[in-house]
């Protein structure tokens, strides 16, 4: 609070008595009983209006307000040049100090002194300005390699001092220990994502900010698979992979690299998969195919043979002709046996 500089003179005896009693006669921190309830401490949120209550005993008594040793008001005279301060005048006895848009610089002790015909009476109020939490510094988004040690930083101000907590935003999100720093040792790909810092002190809503962590890792091929391949028709092989940065895919048949548009081959590459399609399968297309996935951290591959379909039908282990012959033989033997038993029965 900006107060008028020293140099103002006392123009009447009661003001001199007030100043002398406040600055000389009363020990620091001493309070005198009032006929009204005294307020020892007041909590006000930053930006709000604080009203420090003080009352005169009668219309003849005079009052004064001080902040530490600086005079704010003496009677109806304002000594402070701060436009935010004023005296409340709800009634003749009301001599409350009003401070608009309070700030942390308004923190501290305030003294109201009432000068009567006998002795001055004083009341002290300690004003505490509470400040909502505010995160003023947090780690930037980062990209690091898997296995690296990481420290995330989140700094905040507020009064009371805010409690800082961290949370990993993921399907298996779990809170970490409170603190300005979050240490992650040997970070894994599963620990990539957004980390949320929250600063809270119950004065207002928590202040929340996020850090995005990208974890690079070498590619892996999770699956390589083909569908039914029939000569004269289309066939495809699908290669599923993962890696950060996203891997680049290549295809080989044996030792020969394949390219899109070569001999009826179509290659479609995506961030996590590659699809090789043969538009018109011939005998030359059968063989061993290899999918290669690579990024700046490494290379991996997986192979799959592309074979022609089997000519044997389900449940049949021989030719149709052989099966027909066996069936005919079985019928012939059955007929011979039946005739033999019938002849024996007639003879008996």
Curated annotation (Swiss-Prot):
Question: Could you confirm whether the keyword Cytoplasm appears in this record?
Answer: no
Name a GO CC annotation attached to this entry. Answer: plasma membrane
Q: Which InterPro entries match?
A: Ig-like_dom, Ig-like_dom_sf, Ig-like_fold, Ig_I-set, Ig_sub, Ig_sub2, IgLON_domain
Tissue-specific expression: Expressed in brain.
What kind of membrane protein is this, topologically?
A: Lipid-anchor; GPI-anchor
- Name the lipidated positions (GPI-anchor amidated glycine): 318
The places in or outside the cell where this protein is found are:
Cell membrane
GO molecular function list = transmembrane transporter binding
- Which residues form each disulfide bond in the chain? 54-112, 154-197, 239-291
The job of this chain, per UniProt, is described as: May be involved in cell-adhesion. May function as a trans-neural growth-promoting factor in regenerative axon sprouting in the mammalian brain.
Record's protein name = Neuronal growth regulator 1
Query: What is the species of this protein?
Result: Mus musculus
């Amino acid at each position: 609070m900006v107060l008028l500089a020293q140099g103002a003179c006392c123009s009447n005896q009661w003001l001199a008595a007030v100043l002398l009693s406040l600055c000389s006669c009363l020990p620091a921190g001493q309070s005198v009983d009032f006929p009204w309830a005294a307020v020892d401490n007041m909590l006000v949120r930053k930006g709000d209006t604080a009203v420090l209550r003080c009352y005169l005993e009668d219309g003849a008594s005079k009052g004064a307000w001080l902040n530490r040793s600086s005079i704010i008001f003496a009677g109806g005279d304002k000594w402070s040049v701060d436009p935010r301060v004023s005296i409340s005048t709800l009634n003749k006895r009301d001599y409350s100090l009003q401070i608009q848009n309070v700030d942390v610089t308004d923190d501290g002790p305030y003294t109201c002194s009432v000068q009567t015909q006998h002795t001055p009476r004083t009341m002290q109020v300690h004003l505490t300005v509470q400040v909502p939490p505010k995160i003023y510094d947090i780690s930037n988004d980062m990209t690091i390699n898997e296995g690296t040690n990481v420290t995330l930083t989140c700094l905040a101000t507020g009064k009371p001092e805010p409690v800082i907590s961290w949370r990993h935003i993921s399907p298996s999100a779990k809170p970490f220990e409170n603190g300005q720093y979050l240490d992650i040792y040997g970070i894994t790909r599963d620990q990539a994502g957004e980390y949320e810092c929250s600063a809270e002190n119950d004065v207002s809503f928590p202040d929340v900010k996020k850090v995005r962590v990208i974890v690079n890792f070498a590619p892996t091929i999770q699956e390589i698979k083909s569908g039914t391949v029939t000569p004269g028709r289309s066939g495809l092989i699908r290669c599923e992979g993962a890696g950060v940065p996203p891997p680049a895919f290549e295809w080989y048949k044996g030792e020969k690299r394949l390219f899109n548009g070569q001999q009826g081959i179509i290659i479609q590459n995506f961030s996590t998969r590659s699809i090789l399609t043969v538009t018109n399968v011939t005998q030359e297309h059968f063989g061993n195919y290899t999918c290669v996935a690579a990024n700046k951290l490494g290379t991996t591959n997986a192979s799959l043979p592309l074979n022609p379909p089997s000519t044997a039908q389900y449940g049949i282990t021989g030719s149709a002709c052989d099966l027909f012959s066996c069936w005919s033989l079985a019928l012939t033997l059955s007929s011979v046996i039946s005739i033999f038993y019938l002849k024996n029965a007639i003879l008996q």
